[in-house]
Amino acid sequence: TLAGLALTASGLSSITSCTEEKKRRLVFYFTGTGNCLYVARKFAENPLSIPQIIRQDKLEFEADEIGIVYPIYGHLAPQMVQEFIRKARLKAPYLFSILTYGNRKCSATELWNNLATENGTRFDYITTLKMVDNFLPSFDMNEQVKIDKQEDKQIAEIMQDIQARKHWIQPVTEEEQQQHAEFMQRAGHTLSPSAEKLLVIKENCIGCGICVKVCPRRNYTL
């Protein structure tokens, strides 16, 4: 048709059929340093920040697809993400979660699936995504950035799974379960809510205030 020729001439060679409905996807994220925001933006144009959303009185959401992206903290979801999944009511034909980590994931997918199920949310797809580890007390960032963890390749594979609405919960091995049990015995006390108040300020602090601006829990003042 003339309309089709005009579109082709203008460079718009592919158009979406008027009868084809675009799926509405909501993606919620929690990020401390930006890793999970980067991932969330790959799956939704305007992802929703859990620290901002959780202040709402009503946490009921409905869409064609709903996803949650968060960093694994000590094999667990951050406290605020745990609070969100306990309070929120997520209604969608397809629910997915992407858990990012830098070193070991251990029982993270299993623990998250159990927590969500106990609180009335059943995820169809839960996977992990290995990225740069930015837990500064344990890792040297200069060394971490040298490691090619192929984040974008992993994201592309996850994206294919979600587009196909794959039903899959990443399995946890017995070795990973044992690693988690040993970790909790050794350092479980540092994962309590009180650990959020632990802060070390050294003489090299320049008072820029970035920590105050980016902290999702508003733990810091300057």
Labelled PLM ranges:
Residues 12-30, 39, 45:
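C-terminal segment of N-terminal export signals and the immediately downstream linker at the start
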Residues 51-133:
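Helix-loop-strand module that forms the ligand-binding subsite of alpha/beta enzymes
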Residues 121, 160-168, 210-216:
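Generic secondary-structure signature for well-ordered alpha-helical cores
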Residues 136-176:
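Glycine-rich phosphate/pyrophosphate-binding loop and the adjoining helix
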Residues 172-186:
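Active-site rim beta-loop-alpha module in soluble metabolic enzymes
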Residues 184-222:
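Ferredoxin-like iron-sulfur electron-transfer modules
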